[in-house]
Amino acid sequence: MTTWDKCLKKIKKNLSTFEYKTWIKPIHVEQNSNLFTVYCNNEYFKKHIKSKYGNLILSTIQECHGNDLIIEYSNKKFSGKKITEVITAGPQANFFSTTSVEIKDESEDTKVVQEPKISKKSNTKDFSSSQELFGFDEAMLITAKEDEEYSFGLPLKEKYVFDSFVVGDANKIARAAAMQVSINPGKLHNPLFIYGGSGLGKTHLMQAIGNHAREVNPNAKIIYTNSEQFIKDYVNSIRLQDQDEFQRVYRSADILLIDDIQFIAGKEGTAQEFFHTFNALYENGKQIILTSDKYPNEIEGLEERLVSRFGYGLTVSVDMPDLETRIAILLKKAHDLGQKLPNETAAFIAENVRTNVRELEGALNRVLTTSKFNHKDPTIEVAQACLRDVIKIQEKKVKIDNIQKVVADFYRIRVKDLTSNQRSRNIARPRQIAMSLARELTSHSLPEIGNAFGGRDHTTVMHAVKAITKLRQSNTSISDDYELLLDKISR
């Protein structure tokens, strides 16, 4: 067994499986007496390995080889010419292979899920208070000069299916619930209320429910819309003196999906109509799925009776995906586009774009378009040039002691409480949150983070990260606190 083989066994115990396979397994180490040269393939990889895992590598080699040694980091690929003993992590991990798979573009055609028609009537009633009552002005209303028929709802996009939704810890509960209601509508989780920030996949999940439910039962009457269109449909039904048709259409749905329901808050007439529509569907065992950017009782201006009804079923969140999931999303997106994307470039983009999935995909498109325009492969260097503004923001230094101070102030405790041995809930939970934030926002290793929190073991940090990730899925208060702290620290 070589020195590096011994080191690998020890290093593996200090890292998650993902970290080990992603960052440690791909490197090559050449040993020449007391000189250890770590080959990292490129500059970005070298900087990351050295900054995040350098101390761990050094201490492990010292433990296995002795203190008299020199470690050098190279941004070049290992040549394969064995001068002395070459120590490797085994076959190079596929994760950082520059080979990519190409497939055909998927169709983005849309299909209309439900299009009931109503005939327009020439007579209209006065509707001067539309802006105040419904949130729309006269410009949003249809007129007699438009087409002779008016359609309710919106079409579902065929590209939004469960297979194209990348699952991770941040969304797996929401995805599982969505799949259940698409197979057995009205039986479980009614209503299903999905909430989370913009660009995190709520609309994708909602439309995937509709598309899959249609496959399961082609005869199901499925209506997909958003709150803006729902308001517009209602206003126009009044304008056309045909509210009965509006009610007949929406209240006869087997599955009703409404995106961004928060926008009906404060719209008295529309909110009342939705309330009665909700009751009619619920009492008849029909499935209701809603999305919002906020938890129901946090939607300002939403009637209490609606908040209460939203709580009848299951409320789940979708949060910003972790690094592993962000990488998977980028690779899947490039795959779907039939584009070549080296895995190391995907990792670079994922590490530097942490806002939402929409911006993550936007960054990917920017890199792919630039590389194609310049007839270059989408390398890390190309990504660095394309995303220099984003990187500049992300490179703002975040220190563990700053995280500790912000968290301590937020929970009204002392910084020394976070590093103490106290295990009471009001201290232990903020400590876990601070550890999780340190893991996400800094380049420090698990042992380094543990040491900053009173000399704790790296396994304690791993446990804290896993615990907080799980709690953010099930505990709204913890999730909201974490997002607020993330925002405060990242400013």
UniProtKB/Swiss-Prot annotation:
A GO MF term: ATP binding
The keyword Ribonucleoprotein belongs to this UniProt entry's keyword annotation: no
InterPro entries the UniProt entry points to: AAA+_ATPase, Chromosome_initiator_DnaA, Chromosome_initiator_DnaA-like, Chromosome_initiator_DnaA_CS, DnaA_C, DnaA_dom, DnaA_N_dom, DnaA_N_sf
SMART domains assigned: AAA, Bac_DnaA_C
Residue ranges that the Swiss-Prot or TrEMBL entry lists as coiled coil: none
Pfam families membership: Bac_DnaA, Bac_DnaA_C, DnaA_N
GO cellular component, one term: cytoplasm
Subcellular location: Cytoplasm
UniProt region (Domain I, interacts with DnaA modulators), positions on chain: 1-69
Region ranges (Domain II): 69-154
GO biological process: DNA replication initiation; regulation of DNA replication
Region entry Domain IV, binds dsDNA, spans: 372-491
Main location: cytoplasm
Binding site for ATP: 199, 201-203
Keywords recorded for this protein, A-Z: ATP-binding, Cytoplasm, DNA replication, DNA-binding, Lipid-binding, Nucleotide-binding
Location of the region described as Domain III, AAA+ region in the Swiss-Prot/TrEMBL record: 155-371
NCBIfam families recorded: DnaA (TIGR00362)
Domain note: Domain I is involved in oligomerization and binding regulators, domain II is flexibile and of varying length in different bacteria, domain III forms the AAA+ region, while domain IV binds dsDNA.
Quaternary structure note: Oligomerizes as a right-handed, spiral filament on DNA at oriC.
Family the entry assigns: Belongs to the DnaA family.
Full protein name: Chromosomal replication initiator protein DnaA
Top-level taxonomy: Bacteria, Pseudomonadati, Pseudomonadota, Gammaproteobacteria, Thiotrichales
Record gene name: dnaA
